[in-house]
Amino acid sequence: MIPLQHGLILAAILFVLGLTGLIIRRNLLFMLISLEVMINAAALAFVVAGSYWGQADGQVMYILAITLAAAEASIGLALLLQLYRRRHTLNIDTVSEMRG
């Protein structure tokens, strides 16, 4: 069995990598992928904690997190497609400019 600390450290590393990608990247698609990594890191922490204490609550929360991630990804990708069709770019700096 994997120790609790190792699983939580891995989840924290994944979360920090996702947060770093979210802050550094200027492409909306990569920002969406980084957000997915962060959601999966939180789900991993739930599974590790549930496994450590021998409870099924971690797996239930994992299923809930995956459902949330799937809904977020589908809505996010639909919005990205519409944005790309209108602006022909996914760069956050050019999208945030206002017309005037």
Swiss-Prot record:
Q: What keywords were assigned to this record?
A: Cell inner membrane, Cell membrane, Membrane, NAD, Quinone, Translocase, Transmembrane, Transmembrane helix, Transport, Ubiquinone
EC number in record: 7.1.1.-
Q: Catalyses which reaction? A: a quinone + NADH + 5 H(+)(in) = a quinol + NAD(+) + 4 H(+)(out)
Any one GO CC term of this protein is: NADH dehydrogenase complex
Q: What GO molecular functions are on record for this protein?
A: NADH:ubiquinone reductase (non-electrogenic) activity; quinone binding
A Gene Ontology biological process term? ATP synthesis coupled electron transport
What subcellular compartments does it reside in? Cell inner membrane
How does this protein sit in the membrane? Multi-pass membrane protein
Annotated membrane-spanning segments are 4-24, 28-48, 60-80
Q: Assembly and partners?
A: NDH-1 is composed of 13 different subunits. Subunits NuoA, H, J, K, L, M, N constitute the membrane sector of the complex.
- Family, as annotated: Belongs to the complex I subunit 4L family.
Biological role: NDH-1 shuttles electrons from NADH, via FMN and iron-sulfur (Fe-S) centers, to quinones in the respiratory chain. The immediate electron acceptor for the enzyme in this species is believed to be ubiquinone. Couples the redox reaction to proton translocation (for every two electrons transferred, four hydrogen ions are translocated across the cytoplasmic membrane), and thus conserves the redox energy in a proton gradient.
PANTHER family, per the entry: NADH-UBIQUINONE OXIDOREDUCTASE CHAIN 4L (PTHR11434:SF16), NADH-UBIQUINONE OXIDOREDUCTASE SUBUNIT ND4L (PTHR11434)
Query: Matching HAMAP family, A to Z?
Result: NDH1_NuoK
Q: What is this protein called?
A: NADH-quinone oxidoreductase subunit K
- From which lineage does this chain's organism come? Bacteria, Pseudomonadati, Pseudomonadota, Gammaproteobacteria, Enterobacterales
